[in-house]
Amino acid sequence: MKTVSFLEFCKEIEKRVIGQEEVKRVCYNIYHYLELIAKGSRKSLPFILAAPSGCGKSETYRAVKDYFNKELHFLSCIYVDASELTEAGYKGNNPETVVNGLLERPNSNGIGIVFLDEMDKKMIPSYNSMGQNVNAAVQHGLLTIIEGREVTATNHSEVRVNTNNTLFIAMGAFDFVRASKEEEKFISLGETKGKRDHFDGITREEMLEAGAVNELVGRFQSIINYHRLTEESVRKIVDLNVKELSEEFDINIFVRDDVYSAMYAVSNGKFGCRLLKSILRERVQAMDMKRKLCGKSAPPVAFILNGDGDCCLEYEDVC
């Protein structure tokens, strides 16, 4: 990491992951891992990224992967859907398959970042016909891999990967915990009874209560939580998406002020910014299709979006 400063790395990721202050901690943990690898240390520091749906979890992975593909192309950034993992000996992907992607880089010796997405899905008990908790078995299978050991790659029987050199980042929305937060009533001194926030941070204790294996949760050094987006952050996200749509459709798009208020409410719903992006795209596509069906050959001067999610066209007067 001699050629890349932490500040530079962090700023680049924050251009993509907007409005999440805790993304700095994600960047720091990754940067510190690479510093340790550069020193020859085998001390990996796995962590959990808990983020409500649509708040930047997947974008964090994509931003980190894109950055290292450009700046440190020798470093593998692997995506694994943990919800597809099965207990060793059963049909499907057993826990050891999580290292297979590291073999795409020759002589990696296990150096790389493995993003275990949907890890929260494996922390909920799931029982087979014999009453065995199969998800607990998967968690136990991941234990020593995350802690660090040599693993024989399932698709290359002659190759062994040392996961002491690997950084594991478990990711999840933890919707099952958030649902219980919303249902739970609590009373504090001087406060009235009310519901807890869907966007409150997830704790180790809540993971354990939901069914996570204590030993596995303990292997992760820290939990990083993403939170509710601010109005300023939503404005930036709307502007960024509008810019991308303008370039894609080769038009100018103007956004009225009430759009930002409407999109703020959308962004902090249970679907997050993912729904915001879908709404903007659907409205622009619908109006572009209408324009083309009407036989308008000249591009419109502007699509104007309003807070109801509708838009209208304004054409340049060429007469």
Annotate each predicted stretch with a short phrase.
Residues 30-31, 210, 232, 236-250:
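Conserved AAA+ ATPase "sensor/coupling" helix adjacent to the nucleotide-binding pocket
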Residues 78-109:
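Short glycine-rich substrate-engagement loop in P-loop NTPases that contacts/grips substrate
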Residues 59-69, 100-106, 120-232, 244-245:
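Canonical AAA+ ATPase core
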Residues 35, 39-80, 104:
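Walker A/P-loop
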Residues 2-26, 83-92, 228, 232, ...:
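Dynamic helix-loop-helix/coil hinge segments at AAA+ ATPase domain boundaries and subdomain interfaces
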Residues 3-46, 287-292:
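Pre-Walker A (pre-P-loop) alpha-helix and adjacent loop at the N terminus of AAA/AAA+ ATPase modules
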Residues 53-55, 67, 83-87, 119-122, ...:
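Conserved nucleotide-binding/hydrolysis micro-motifs of P-loop NTPases
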Residues 59-62, 169, 175, 264-319:
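C-terminal engagement/docking regions of AAA+ P-loop ATPases
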